[in-house]
Amino acid sequence: SASKGAVIAMTRTAAKELGARGITVNAIAPGFIETPMTDGMTDQQKEAILSRITLGRAGTPEDVAAAVAFLAGEGGSYITGQVLEVSGGIVM
């Protein structure tokens, strides 16, 4: 989508501009995450999405938080300009 393309472009541009200062810039692209926002979906709608997820389950806010913590911590110190898909494989 255009909005996803814009996020990718902004992430890469900011990473290039800020890298010389030792600042890393990355983005998280969450897939289907079970939150109060998804509570309004029907079981049929949820199943249609879940059937496309390689890992066979919805993600959790904790899954996204773990990715953020990784990128913000020492493990992510040499990663910049990347978009990390936290999607259970739905995007493959």
What are these model-predicted stretches?
Residues 8, 25, 29-40:
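Short, flexible catalytic-loop segment of classical short-chain dehydrogenase/reductase
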Residues 9, 27, 50-75, 79, ...:
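C-terminal helical subdomain
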Residues 16-20, 77:
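Alpha-helical segment proximal to the catalytic Tyr-Lys
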Residues 21, 26, 82:
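Rossmann-like NAD(H)/NADP(H) cofactor-binding core
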Residues 39-53:
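A short C-terminal helix-loop "cap" of Rossmann-like NAD(P)-dependent dehydrogenase/epimerase domains
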